[in-house]
Amino acid sequence: MTTDKVEPILFIFTGPSGAGKGSVMRALLRDDPTLRKVVTYTTRSPREGEVDGFDYRFVSVQQFLQLVEQGKIFEYENVYRDHYYGSPRELFVPGNDGIIELDYKGRIKYQERWRQVISIFLMPPSLDELKKRILSRSHVANLSARLDNAVEQLRHAKSYDYVVKNDDLDQCVARVADIVRVERLRRDGRYQLDEMIHELQDER
């Protein structure tokens, strides 16, 4: 858990549609009470099992554009037709690290805004499995557009801090949890070192 002095980490998750980002993030939140999800906005309809205010904040296109005008949405993308996705300007619950789902463009904007950003790209196990997952949640007419978007996301994967293949959900969650632990240790160790240096300087 962070303190007022330790800057929280924002863990950004990116991956093509059907890569399992939501499942991995839900498992992390279940297992780690010190993580908080940054809930983003979308104008698409909720999928089965999705909860408004947890998975997304589901709003109309008109409401979404009003939030943009009011400055409450920091960055947004029009992904498919009238399917807008946007991120809130206010990110963190004090004392907690955050996790958020963004595409590569949103990731770049947040890296420019925050120092403590760790980016994690989730890969599907195979192209065939990616197609199956996309078809299971959208009409076949949308397959081409969603595959084009997946290719665009995959092209930017090498620029992420970590790339994790989601071929087994439990193993993928364990790998990502290890990343969270390592990055927290790195952050906390640097903070403790800075504190020691400041104390030594004060004693001189």
Language model segments and positions:
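NTP-dependent small-molecule kinase module
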Residues: 4, 132-138, 155-204
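Extreme N-terminal, non-catalytic leader segments
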Residues: 1-10
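P-loop (Walker A) phosphate-binding loop of NTP-binding proteins
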Residues: 14-16
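Walker A/P-loop
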Residues: 22
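ATP-binding Walker
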Residues: 19
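ATP-dependent small-molecule kinase phosphotransfer cores
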Residues: 42-98, 104-108
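Post-Walker A helix-loop "phosphate-sensing" segment adjacent to the P-loop in P-loop NTPases
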Residues: 30-38
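Conserved phosphate-donor/acceptor-positioning beta-strand/loop module used by diverse small-molecule
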Residues: 99-103, 112-134, 165-168
